[in-house]
Amino acid sequence: MRFLQSKLLLIGSGKWPEKIASIVQSQNLVSEITNIAAREFLKLGTKQVELLLQGKTLWIATTPENQLMILEQIKGLRNKVIIEKPIALNLDQLSRLFTHNRISNNKLYVSEPWRHSEIWGKAKNRLTSFSGFKKLQINRGGPIERDYMDPPWDWMQHDLGLLSELLSINDRSLEFQCKFLNNGKNLEIIIESRNQYQIEINLGLFQERTEQWILDDKLFIDFADRDSFNDQPTCNMFKFVCNDEFTSDLESQVWLTSEIITKLEEIKFA
């Protein structure tokens, strides 16, 4: 694989797009960065969009609904597109995302830097080398609340994306239980895989930033401890997307998240 230095178009406003720009610039991964607010991008005409995206990798960092409208706007183009978490807040948005992915010429990839981190590579090797039943507790969240979604949605994809590499979409023994707590500000997810894992995930509102995996009652990973790793996961992910052999398989990437969103939809209408 060969990394191709890219021109980057960032769609979105706020601290996270600014941080993305800072990270990729610090490692000299892009020759040019253009940033535009999502609302301004959605006002552009077809020719303006084509000119703006020409020869660029696209990174969309906005709300799920805005993200879907942008994807609809660019569906006729052929760009690599990084989309941000959360990918959807309900089953309708998820279905629209999958439909777009199937009909679009763009290559979509969900932004999941931890998949490309050294700490996760080592952790995954340890987990897959352990024989026998494993009990895993995951706590992830923080004090931030957004006006357009409840806190669990902010954090859901982080761990489900990683777990999707440990669990198998073809494992018919997988069982899911989901329960909203604290007036929707927290979410408990239980995933059981016969003879392999019992996983309890606690997401949402915490007094302070919390990103811990606890294996058999012992701290296994603390993603919040930035001193415990030396690599740059965001840069690693960007290089992965920008390499000349990059291929996209969005639905496989988010299969576990799709299962949970479907389960939550069942609960809502039960």
PLM region spans:
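Short amphipathic alpha-helix with an adjacent loop that forms part of the alpha/beta core around
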Residues: 44-54, 125
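N-terminal Rossmann-like dinucleotide-binding module
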Residues: 1-43, 52, 270
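Catalytic nucleophile loop
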Residues: 17, 67, 159
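Beta-strand-loop-alpha-helix segment that lines the small-molecule cofactor/substrate pocket
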Residues: 57-64, 68-112
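A contiguous active-site-proximal alpha/beta segment in oxidoreductase catalytic domains
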Residues: 88-144
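NAD(P)-dinucleotide binding in Rossmann-like oxidoreductases
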Residues: 179-185, 190-251
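C-terminal helix-rich "cap/oligomerization" subdomain common to oxidoreductases
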Residues: 1-2, 8-11, 41-44, 55-62, ...
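Rossmann-like dinucleotide-binding domain that binds NAD(P)(H)
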Residues: 142-207
